[in-house]
């Protein structure tokens, strides 16, 4: 038995251990090591035929439980559909109604509607007020159970449970980690273009549960998560020079990151969470510095008569990619995390900016400006394999999902409107708009919460 302990509720705490406990018994996981039949998604760089999957409403013991169960099934359905790897079957086509998940389904009924995988689940309220969630994942062709788990949580976290289950399904059927149990911090924009109010905001990756972290008194840009997901670093234009701040999501407290002369901007955490790398303006130049958050000591990494900005660490923390105009136009460079010689990796026509390293380490995403368009693309760290994923009037600010398979960015269509968030996978397929309350820009995807 696997036990995940801790049920204390923390209002802004994102870590799973303070919200949800789960356990998986041998009975629940029976068959999970069996060979897969047809229910398997092969992820390649080319087109992928989405896997037909049936996701009935989770059953419950009361009308209230049934309502929550329907909501959980809907969130799972939307998550898997938006990934582009799954084709959820309309519930109107179902022949069999699932009423008891402890009884194996009649797989012939699900084969008839061409389902290759089936998800069944149950939501029940416990005597202590907690919500118990259970699910089973079935291979319809073989009749084998592929996965199963049960969780206990406070009722208000039912959406979080749905995201965790979505990740379990995604991983079992693709062989790769999911990305649904994650958050996005972004800049919420409201008001006219002449009097735009910008606030830091936090939401689930699907656009739900939006929370505002700042009030909009000062302009904010480029928020970035810490590896623990408990802190955000960002740039704020207050009185005086723009500064880099550190915001604690749990407590709501913020602090300035170093009291440097001149501007500080483009902050990002190191993978260990103990350092922040940023650009500092000195005279007419901007160079890269790294600050140790414990000792407050600062180390200079670049020293050129140019503008070096937008740094991003490799997942292992050994290298940094950044933007520099030291060769004329802004281009992408890679160097060791302690400084030294930098290698230019972008050589296409146009200017390159906002580089960010994939959590997988295989690609660096960027914004490219040229030919009257702004494009989002990816390139390998050695400079090979450059690929443009999407182009338009103004696309900018890519950020990777925790599994490195999906990018989020913002697009401003012009014409007096405002920007919106979009996702696209690294093959350039499945471009989708992300729902937000208003205009939105500068997204940053968190690591997985669980």
UniProtKB/Swiss-Prot annotation:
Gene3D superfamilies: TolB, C-terminal domain, TolB, N-terminal domain. The keyword Lyase does not apply. Pfam families: PD40 (PF07676), TolB_N (PF04052). It is found in: Periplasm. GO terms for biological process: cell division; protein import. The keyword Cell division applies. Coiled coil: none annotated. It comes from the Bacteria. Residues 1-37 form the signal peptide. Keywords: Cell cycle, Cell division, Periplasm, Signal. InterPro entries: 6-blade_b-propeller_TolB-like, PD40, Tol-Pal_TolB, TolB_N. Its main location: periplasm. One of its GO terms (cellular component) is periplasmic space. NCBIfam families: propeller_TolB. The Tol-Pal system is composed of five core proteins: the inner membrane proteins TolA, TolQ and TolR, the periplasmic protein TolB and the outer membrane protein Pal. They form a network linking the inner and outer membranes and the peptidoglycan layer. Part of the Tol-Pal system, which plays a role in outer membrane invagination during cell division and is important for maintaining outer membrane integrity. HAMAP family: TolB (MF_00671). Belongs to the TolB family. This is Tol-Pal system protein TolB. The lineage of its organism: Bacteria, Pseudomonadati, Pseudomonadota, Alphaproteobacteria, Hyphomicrobiales. The gene is tolB.
């Amino acid at each position: 038995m696997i036990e995940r302990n801790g049920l204390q509720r923390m209002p802004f705490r994102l870590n799973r251990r303070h919200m949800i406990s789960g356990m998986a018994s041998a009975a629940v996981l029976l068959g999970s090591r069996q060979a897969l039949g047809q229910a398997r998604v092969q992820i390649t760089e080319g087109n992928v035929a989405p896997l037909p999957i049936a996701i009935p409403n989770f059953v419950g013991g009361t009308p209230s439980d049934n309502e929550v169960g329907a909501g959980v099934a809907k969130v799972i359905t939307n998550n898997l559909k938006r990934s582009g790897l799954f084709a959820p079957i309309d519930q109107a086509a179902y022949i069999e109604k699932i009423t008891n998940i402890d009884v194996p389904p009649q797989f012939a009924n699900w084969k008839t509607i061409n389902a290759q995988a089936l998800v069944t689940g149950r939501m029940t309220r416990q005597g202590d007020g907690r919500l118990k969630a259970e699910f089973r994942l079935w291979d319809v062709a073989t009749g084998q159970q592929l996965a199963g788990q049960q969780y206990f949580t406070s009722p208000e976290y039912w959406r979080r449970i749905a995201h965790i289950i979505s990740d379990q399904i995604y991983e079992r059927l693709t062989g790769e980690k999911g990305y649904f149990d994650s958050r996005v911090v972004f800049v919420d924009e409201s008001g006219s273009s002449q009097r735009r109010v910008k606030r830091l905001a936090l939401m689930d990756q699907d656009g739900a549960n939006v929370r505002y972290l700042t009030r909009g008194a000062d302009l904010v840009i480029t928020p970035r998560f810490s590896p623990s997901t408990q802190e955000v670093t960002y740039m704020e234009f207050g009185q005086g020079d723009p500064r880099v701040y550190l915001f604690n999501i749990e407590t709501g407290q913020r602090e300035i990151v170093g009291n440097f002369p001149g501007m500080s901007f483009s902050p990002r955490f190191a993978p260990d969470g103990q350092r922040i790398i940023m650009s500092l303006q000195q005279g007419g130049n901007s160079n890269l510095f790294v600050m140790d958050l414990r000792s407050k000591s600062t180390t200079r990494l670049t020293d050129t008569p140019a503008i070096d900005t937008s740094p991003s660490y490799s997942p292992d923390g050994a290298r940094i990619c950044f933007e520099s105009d030291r060769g004329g136009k802004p281009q992408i460079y890679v160097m060791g995390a302690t400084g030294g010689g930098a290698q230019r990796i972008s050589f296409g026509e146009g200017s390159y900016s906002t580089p960010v390293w994939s959590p997988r380490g295989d690609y660096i995403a960027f914004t490219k400006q040229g030919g009257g368009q702004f494009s989002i693309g990816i390139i390998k760290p050695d400079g090979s394999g450059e690929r443009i994923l999407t182009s338009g009037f103004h696309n900018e600010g890519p950020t990777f999902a925790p599994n490195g398979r999906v990018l989020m960015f913002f697009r401003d269509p012009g014409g007096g409107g405002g920007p919106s968030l979009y996702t696209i996978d690294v093959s350039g397929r499945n471009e989708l708009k992300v729902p937000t309350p208003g205009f939105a820009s500068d997204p940053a995807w968190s690591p997985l919460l669980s």
